[in-house]
From Swiss-Prot:
Keywords assigned by UniProt, alphabetized: Aspartyl protease, Cell inner membrane, Cell membrane, Hydrolase, Membrane, Protease, Transmembrane, Transmembrane helix
Subcellular location: Cell inner membrane
Gene Ontology annotations of biological process type: proteolysis
Primary subcellular site in the record, as a coarse category: membrane
Pfam families xref list: Peptidase_A8 (PF01252)
InterPro entries per record: Peptidase_A8 (IPR001872)
UniProt-recorded name of the protein: Lipoprotein signal peptidase
Organism: Xanthomonas euvesicatoria pv. vesicatoria (strain 85-10) (Xanthomonas campestris pv. vesicatoria)
Length: 172
């Protein structure tokens, strides 16, 4: 009797869909409700809503590169999302330490791709600051990407079960 195959972690793509939905809903709210480049205090001395735009990547990297970066970052995000989705298909459903961060990165990357294709830039609106020190504005998609990247690094560093093949959930 053959063993039943272990279901893949592709079900975790539902989390990616949730991230994309929350990200796009929040950006639609921002575009319809917040003034451009005007702080709206949420927690005085720490957190503002601040509608701004980013044509580059994290911390506005390459934002003044002349336009080619839109297609570069779109292709990069789609490529990485495709690779992570492939790895999800090769990961056992119960391997949440791999599946959760992959799904977060996919959702965040696709959320920002939608912005780039619809608007030519990414809509950012969360601004944290202390005194005159301001963290660059970001959005829900950015948060998911960072959370996923941290998860990949932390779970990869502290995995005590042995070495895993990337995206498989299988031990080497």
């Amino acid at each position: 009797m053959s063993q039943r195959p272990n279901p893949s972690a592709l079900i975790w793509l539902l989390l990616s869909v949730l991230v994309v939905g929350l990200d796009q809903w929040s950006k639609a709210w921002v575009l319809s409700s917040l003034p451009e480049y005007t702080p709206v205090p949420v927690i005085d001395g720490f957190w503002n809503w601040y509608r701004t735009y980013n044509t580059g990547a994290a911390f506005s990297f390459l934002s003044d590169a002349g336009g080619w970066q839109l297609w570069f970052f779109t292709a990069l995000a789609v490529g990485i999302s495709g690779l992570l989705a492939f790895w999800l298909s090769r990961t056992a459903r119960g391997q949440w330490r791999s599946a959760l961060p992959y799904a977060l990165v996919i959702g965040g990357a696709i959320g920002n791709v939608i912005d780039r294709l619809m608007h030519g830039h990414v809509v950012d609106f969360i601004q944290w600051y202390i005194g005159s020190h301001t963290w660059p504005s970001f959005n829900i998609a950015d948060s998911a990407i960072v959370g996923g990247a941290i998860g990949i690094a932390v779970f990869g560093l502290f995995d005590k079960s042995g070495k895993q093949e990337p995206g498989t959930g299988n031990l080497r």
